[in-house]
Amino acid sequence: YDAQMDEESLGNWVREKSIIAGTEIFEEERVERFTSRGEITSSRFGRRQYDVIVNAAGPWAAQLNENNEISTKFYLRLIRGSHLILDHQVSGSYLFQEHQDGRVVFILPYLGKTLVGTTEVSQLLSENTICTEEERQYLLNVYNSNFKRHVSNSNIISEFSGLRPIVASHLRSKESYFSVASREAETEVVDKLITVYGGKWTSAPSLSEKVVRKLKSKEFL
């Protein structure tokens, strides 16, 4: 169905393709520090020098640069989106625009169950990325407002939340909700450091090509 994806499976597919292409992946490896001069200090390898560093850490990209005293002209707003998995499967796929706030909420068949999402809540990196009771009731109310069969907390078999990094300059103060803001990414080059701000799965291939072009233009490769 349109409007849904299995990002975990897609991420694992990309990971496996990267390994086949010769990429070394170090999971749960803490980077203690990095500089715009290409230096990285990690708990496993100590200090190492690289031709280029690409900071593509998603919601953490801006905070990592700030922690390493690297100035930037871009900042991120983090928007939490929460989803519910209900214990039955709806007969079709639906997109509803809520009259109260104008947001779009989807209700879709998902692995034999029903997926309901998403919310839009601004949050900080220091906060837990979890579905709150307020979000839970919001999504249940959307469902119950559009279907004869009503559901409650007892029908929820799973829930998950994620963060959308949105470049702050893409938000306009007059916007009443975040989904109308541009999800396009920005890239910034500071010496030997390239940082990716924002972005999304659907534009990831073109974004990676853009980063490679920047690498070549700076004669890193």
Stretches found by the model and what they are:
Residues 1-16, 26, 129-134, 197-206:
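Short beta-strand to alpha-helix junction loop
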Residues 22-24, 193:
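Short, conserved active-site loop motifs that form the nucleotide-linked donor/cofactor pocket
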Residues 33, 60-62, 92, 122:
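Glycine-rich nucleotide phosphate-binding loop and flanking beta-alpha elements
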Residues 55-70:
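Flavin (primarily FAD) binding-site architecture
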Residues 71-115, 121-221:
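C-terminal catalytic lobe of FAD-dependent flavoproteins
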